[in-house]
Amino acid sequence: MKNPYFPTALGLYFNYLVHGMGVILMSLNMASLETLWQTNAAGVSIVISSLGIGRLSVLLFAGLLSDRFGRRPFIMLGMCCYMAFFFGILHTNNIIIAYVFGFLAGMANSFLDAGTYPSLMEAFPRSPGTANILIKAFVSSGQFLLPLIISLLVWAELWFGWSFMIAAGIMFINALFLYRCTFPPHPGRRLPVIKKTTSSTEHRCSITDLASYSLYGYISMATFYLVSQWLAQYGQFVAGMSYTMSIKLLSIYTVGSLLCVFITAPLIRNTVRPTTLLMLYTFISFIALFTVCLHPTFYVVIIFAFVIGFTSAGGVVQIGLTLMAERFPYAKGKATGIYYSAGSIATFTIPLITAHLSQRSIADIMWFDTAIAAIGFLLALFIGLRSRKKTRHHSLKENVAPGG
């Protein structure tokens, strides 16, 4: 039987194609925005940082409320905030007002996350990991398409703002589509009697689980965020690549992340435990980073770009969220809020640390990321072993129950 929520899921995924564009729109149009806002690159960078602050400010709050009031209102609110950002950022010459619109875009990201991830897990309860990993494919697709769109606008000598307008147009059409779609029921609509049939400890997330998954949310985000920001500079100034070649490393990185999504999704759905992939991908990320730090040569860096895109940016963050959400079966929005709040903190702290390290050597930045990946692997190992222990314990209880 066809899943009735497939059209809804498709609309939710298209939101993240636009989100993928939104994340890099200002950085790719930096020169034009400098002129528009009468500022310099540092001023535009300050506005870009507002996205992270806006995201963190409401993420946990939005997740909790989505469990109570439903997913649709927050998804629609996120789409409206994003459209306001796309239009507003182009119609101001004041950097302070631009910062406010950037903050609004960060809030939009939080509202979408709080409603989308739980909706997909509730729409596809038998394959929540696959459903969430596909989000990454659409984000990467948006980030792959936007440079092509901007290149076309430059070639045709058209207004740079059309890149914002195209993103806003896709979001508007998708909002009309999703408004007519049916969303799966969320736990807040279910009768409390259902909870009485289940042991209170069976679905309770311990402090240890909460801490380990939250820390993994920070570590996994930090690992790929650092690479995405410094890969080109590492290729140019450490490996000795030309500027044009170092920029292409990001395209190789994106191809790796997309390929991982399409390989990982069927694996999780059919054969492999999510915890196994969590441990495997984190371990490979550590080995790749360690290798490129020891041998920063032309070809090693090219191979590294693909491998690190595959293992760190190809859905491992979403796998971690899916595993955490299993500990919160009646509060998936809360789980999403906690997990991505930890990840958002990484987007603040990592740039501060790397800014200091870059004054000494860009090579030190990758060594720092290697240390982060090592901690991430130990953490993934702990999560995996703990998850298997709980699964084994649950199986023993089920086997004993009939005889008791």
Please place each PLM-identified region on the residue numbering.
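C-terminal transmembrane helical hairpin of 12-TM major facilitator-type secondary transporters
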Residues: 274-319
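Cytoplasmic helix-loop-helix junction between adjacent transmembrane helices
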Residues: 101-137
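Conserved MFS/SLC helix-loop-helix module at the cytosolic interface between two early adjacent transmembrane helices
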Residues: 57-94
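Helix-to-loop junctions at the C-terminal end of transmembrane segments
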Residues: 58-70, 260-273, 358
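A late C-terminal transmembrane helix in Major Facilitator Superfamily
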Residues: 325-361, 369
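Extracytoplasmic gate region of multi-pass secondary transporters
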Residues: 26-27, 206-251, 258
